[in-house]
C-alpha cells in the first residue's frame, strides 16, 4: 500500500498525498476500549477491514450515514465531558501586528470568543489592537484597549473577578504574560483557572531545557543542544555540539533572536544579541538542508487526538517556516515517513498534556528515516491559521470548545455540519502558502532570510495540482508578479545557495534562462527534486507559449494545458504578444473556463454543507449552483506594510451589514490570517486571487448583483475601472472618479476648480523641468507617483543632486501614470479626515490630529481623536473641505483625506489648510475612528453604497467627549537587521495599537506600553540623547528634573543640551560589542535620537545610535513631538509608578465605559 501510494503520487502529476489517503486511521483516545469502538477510516481510501466491535458500533450509527456528534454519545462508548464551570472568561489578545505575530491571532481570538459566547460564557477581551475584528462590540461582552502586560492584566483581573482565562489565542504575547502572572501568583490569589493547555505544559514547550528533557522521556529525538543563559556558556556549548550551530531563543516569537553561527566570532555576537531579547537560548547542532515538516494536532482532556493537517516546506531547513513556501498536504513524504511523524506528534502532544491545539515542527533527513523535533507550539500559531484555512477545519473554535471541557467526538464540525470534530480532514487539492516581504522599503536592510522571520504577511492558494496552486500564490504575493517568472541576478549561484526574499525567482532564472539542470539546482538549494520537477513542467509550458508567439496560435489544447499549469490570461498575453482582454476573449471562444470546487474537508467522501470555494481548471464540473446572485465584497489580500488587519475589519464590517440588510454575500480574498476568510462570515467565500481575471470570472459565474471595491484597500481600487469598462456593476463611487482621485494630476486640477487649497505642484515629464520647478518653489520638495499604497517611492528631496535618482525610482513604480512634484512644507501639522458620503452629500466624518509634524507617513504617525489642540474654526473648515470634495467627486461610500495645517505669514491667526491626499475608499484609520467615536463608519458606508436604510447626516465632531484615544504605530525593527529606524514619508510600521485616556498624555502613556517590548525608563537609569534638533535642550532639561542620568555621544551634542549637563561617553560606531558594554556600564535604558535627516551611511553616528537601541532592546524615541509628549506623560504618570501604594490606574476602564454606549 505504501509503495502503491508513493508510486502513484510520483506517476500522476500533482496528485495530492492526502487524496490517496493511505490508511489515515483516526488515532483517538488512549483508552483501548474506546479505540476499538471508534468509526474506522473515513478520511481516505482505501478502507481497512472493520473489526467486530467497530461493526457493532456502526450498526448503531449506520455506516451509510455520515456520523454525527450525538450518535457517538448515544452509542454509550463515549461519555459527554464534564464541562468547565466558568461564567466569566478573560481572552488575552496579541496586541499590535508585528513580524512573527500578525493577523492570525485576530482570526483565532475571534473564533474563540464566538465559541465561548455560544456556550453562554461572559467574555472579556484585553487587546490594544483597535483594528481587529475581535475588538468589535458584536463579539466580546466587554473590551479593554490596554497593554497586554502583567501589570495591566493584574488590574483587569482584580477589577472584573473572572473565573477563567484563555492564554493560547493571543500568540507569544499572551503566552508569555500568562506564565509571568502564574509565577507572580496572580491566578492562584484571584482564583482564576487557566483553561485549555495547563501552564506547566506551556512552560515545558517554551523552556528549551525542560522541553528537551520531556522529549527524551518518551524517546523522541531532538537536535543535540544545550540551553544557556550567558555568552560564555554558549561558546562552551558550541564546542560540545560542534559547529555549525543554530541559536534558538526561549519565550520568543517567529524565531526572534535565532540564527546560524559557523564559528566562535559569529556565535559571540549573535548570542549577545539574543540574550538581550530573551533570558535563555539553545545552542543546537545545525541540520541545515534537511526537510522541514509540520503537523497540526488537536487533543482533548479525555486524551482523544487527531492530526488536522500536515505541511511540508518547499525550502529546506534553515529558513524559518514563516519565511518558507509551505505546501499542504506534504507532497514528497513516503507513507512510512508520514505515519512515523504523525505517530510521534500524537505521542508528544499526549506526553506534554496539551489540551487544545498544538503545532509540531520536524527536521527530516532527505536520505533516511532519521528525524528530529525542532519545536512544539502548544498554542494557536501562524501555522494553525494556515492549517485551518487549508483544510476547512475550525481549529481555534474547536480548541476553545475543548478548553471549556468538551471532547472531540461530542463536538459537531462547525464547517461541514455533518461530521464531528473527531474527523481528520482529507484533502483532494493542494494548498500553497508563500510569504510576503517588504524589505525594499528599508534602508540598509539585510535581504538574507534564515532562522529569524522577516516576512510581513502570507498568501494561500488552492489548486488541484501543485503547479496550479503555486502559480496562483505567486501572483497573490504581489500584483506585479505574473506567476512563474525569472529575475536576473549578478551572481546566480550565490542567489541560489544563500536564500533571500528573491530566491524563488533565481531558481526560475536558472531553469528557464541559464540551462541549469534539476540536479545542479538541487545541489545549490537543497530543494527537493520533486518540487523542482514540477517547476520544470511549468518551464516547458512557458517555452511552448513563447514559441507560439501569437494569439491565433493558441488552440484549445495548449490553452487548456497552460491554464491547468496555472498560467493567467495576463501571463499568456505577455508570452504570445497580445492583450489580456484578447486572451480572455479567445479562451472563452475556445470554451476554456474555470470550475468552482469546494474545500469540504472530506475529499467529497461525505456530503458537506460548506461555503469554502476555489476555482480550478483541473476539473470538469462545478460543486455548486449559481442561483444566489450575491453582492461581491473584495478583500484586501496579503498583509503588507500599508495594508493590514484594518482593511480586513472594513471588509468583514461591510459583509456583516450586507447580511443584516438581507443580502447574500460573496467574499473574495486569499489571506489565511484573516477573519474575512472564516467559514461563517459570508454565504460564499472564494479563496481566490484579487486579479481582474479571477474577479470577473466569479462575477460572471455568480451573476452577482454588484461588486464593492472600496473596503479592501488599494488592490480592489486598482481593478475597479477595468471591471466597470468590461460590464461589471461596481457599487458606490464611480470608478472614473476613483481614477481621478488616484491620478495626482487630475486630482489637483479638480481641487483647483473647487477652490480647495493644496501645496504648489507640477506634473513632471523630465528631470530638467523638475529641477526648474524645485528651484522656483524652493527645496525641500516631495516626489509622489500615482496609484501607490503606503508611500511607495515617495520621497522628500532636499537638494538638486538627489533629484534624478528619486525621479527615476518613482517612474519605476507606476510607469503608466505621470509623477507629480509638490512643495514640501516643513514644520506643518497634519490632520486625517475620515468620512462617508451618499451621492455627494456628507453623512459622517472624523478629524484626527497627528502628533508628529507632516513628513511622517500617516501610517507611521501617532494619531489622537478627538483632536487635542485644534480650534472650533479649524474643525469647521475641515468639514467644509470634506463637503466640497465629496460633492466634486460625487462620492458614495467611504473616503479619507490628509490635510496639512501650515502657518500663513500674512495671517498668523488663520493657518492655511491644504489637502495633500484623498483616497475614495476606506482608509487604515476607519476602525480607529469608528471605535473611538462609537459609530461604525463602514456600516454607514455600506448602507450608502447599496442605498438602503441610509442614516441621516450627523456631525460627530460637534459632540463634546471627556476622553481621548491615541493610536501609535507598532514597528518590527528588531526583525529587520540593519534597517534604519527613522521615520519619513515611506511607511515602515507593521501594525498599530490604541488606548483611551482622560487626556492625550494618559492615552499616549498606555498606548506606548502596548507596543512590543516597550519599557518605561525609570529615574536613576541612563538616557542617551542624540541628533541635531534644537528642541533637545528643553527635553533634556525636563528629563534631568525627573531624575534621569543623561549621556551624549559627542561634545557637539553636549553643547546643544546646555544649560543642562550630560556626560559625554565613548561611542564606537564600528564595534558593536564595545558599544553594548557602554550601554551596560551606564545602564542606558532609553535612546532619544532626534535627527533632522537620515544617516548618509551605516557609520553615521545617529544611525548607529538608533539601530543599536533596537538591537539592544532599549526604548527608542525618534520624533521631536513624540519625545515632548512622552516627557509630559512621564511627569504625570511616574509618581503613581514609583508609589508603593499601587492604585488602579485611571486608564483601566472598559471600552463601553469610555464611549458611554454601544452606538456601533
UniProtKB/Swiss-Prot annotation:
Residues 212-404, 748-946 form the ATP-grasp domain. Belongs to the CarB family. Mn(2+) 1 binds at residues 361, 375. Mg(2+) 4 binds at residues 917, 919. Large subunit of the arginine-specific carbamoyl phosphate synthase (CPSase). CPSase catalyzes the formation of carbamoyl phosphate from the ammonia moiety of glutamine, hydrogencarbonate, and phosphate donated by ATP, the first step of the arginine biosynthetic pathway. The large subunit (synthetase) binds the substrates ammonia (free or transferred from glutamine from the small subunit), hydrogencarbonate and ATP and carries out an ATP-coupled ligase reaction, activating hydrogencarbonate by forming carboxy phosphate which reacts with ammonia to form carbamoyl phosphate. This is Carbamoyl phosphate synthase arginine-specific large chain, mitochondrial. Mg(2+) 3 binds at residues 898, 917. In S.pombe, this enzyme is synthesized by two pathway-specific (arginine and pyrimidine) genes under separate control. One is linked to the arginine pathway and is designated CPSase A (arg5-arg4), it is localized to mitochondria and repressed by arginine. A second one, CPSase P, is part of a multifunctional protein (ura1) encoding 3 enzymatic activities of the pyrimidine pathway (GATase, CPSase, and ATCase); it is localized to the cytoplasm and feedback inhibited and repressed by pyrimidines. Mn(2+) 3 binds at residues 898, 917. Residues 479-623 are annotated as: Oligomerization domain. GO terms for molecular function: ATP binding; carbamoyl-phosphate synthase (ammonia) activity; carbamoyl-phosphate synthase (glutamine-hydrolyzing) activity; metal ion binding. The gene is arg4. Its EC number is 6.3.4.16, 6.3.5.5. ATP 2 binds at residues 784, 823, 825, 830, 855-858, 898, 917. Residues 81-478 are annotated as: Carboxyphosphate synthetic domain. Keywords: Amino-acid biosynthesis, Arginine biosynthesis, ATP-binding, Ligase, Manganese, Metal-binding, Mitochondrion, Nucleotide-binding, Repeat. Coiled coil: none annotated. Residues 624-1012 are annotated as: Carbamoyl phosphate synthetic domain. Mn(2+) 2 binds at residues 375, 377. SMART domains: CPSase_L_D3 (SM01096). Mg(2+) 2 binds at residues 375, 377. It catalyses: hydrogencarbonate + L-glutamine + 2 ATP + H2O = carbamoyl phosphate + L-glutamate + 2 ADP + phosphate + 2 H(+). Its cofactor is Mg(2+); Mn(2+).
